[in-house]
Curated annotation (Swiss-Prot):
DNA-binding region of this protein: 275-309
Keyword Cell cycle: yes
GO molecular function terms noted in the UniProt entry: DNA binding
Free-text function comment from the UniProt entry: Involved in cell division and chromosome segregation.
Keywords (A to Z) from UniProt: Cell cycle, Cell division, DNA-binding
Protein name: Probable cell division protein WhiA
Amino acid sequence: MSFASETKKELTHMDVSDSDAKVELAAFIRMNGAISFSNQLVIMDVQTENAAIARRMYQLLKDLYEVPIELLVRRKMKLKKNNVYIVRLKSGTRGILEDLRILEPPMTFTKSIDRGFVKKRSAKRAYLRGAFLASGSVNNPETSSYHLEIFSVYEEHNEAICALMNQFDLNARTLERKNGFITYLKEAEKITEFLSIIGATSALLHFEDVRIMRDMRNSVNRLVNCETANLNKTINAAVRQIDNIKYIQSTVGLEALPERLREIAALRIANEDVTLKELGEMLTTGQVSKSGINHRLRKLDQIAERLRSGETPAQVGLKVSNS
């Protein structure tokens, strides 16, 4: 089962007050409900592929309204042959839709969320919970990117969901998709806040555990990569220094170098694996700092490069014995 499915399953077990149940139901029906007419009856079908969600919608309707309710199961024949669960209402439909602020007399569908319906903070949470159950999704925190979204067919309703989420400072944004619109979150912290808002505590804890472990792994990897890069840089510098010193030795001899450069050159080729700090401690003329050693080695690099380019020892500032 996906992380999103586990999250929704957890939400279907929540105990809520009648007033919050009504708001949750309103969000779900607005987004997943369909109206048809037969023999002067208004029939409402609420459809989902999630059995737990179907049971919850059935139970909420049953608890709130004393009307006959059917629960049907259909088999999808295309692509994934999943079951489709339909909660069907054949009587009292118009009155229920008006009570849920989805319909206005005589038969006009409202396009957005009734502000009075979500005045209380708990009602706002309930509406977002219903919307997420209807058409929400959230990436597994172990995947490459954090992403939570709620899909809506109608732009005005999508904007209302975004505004509702941002009353909780979630920094939600909207985006047009091929067949509708989405309100989405990309920040891990905002996703955990949203899970807390809708009451998905277990999902929140799992998300946070995975996120913390993932962030720790990323930090360790960055540290290792940084240390590896520094180590490679140090090794490459040491190899270059030794090659340059050996070139000076084979062309003009180390004796041609000034004393302070001659001593460090001899120590470097005799101790290829030691650090600059350790080289500084080996000098018989007195301990020199790491930066001081690095400065002398850079001077040796410059001398070697100038000799390679064709300059004479005298031009480089070296004294070569004629004997």
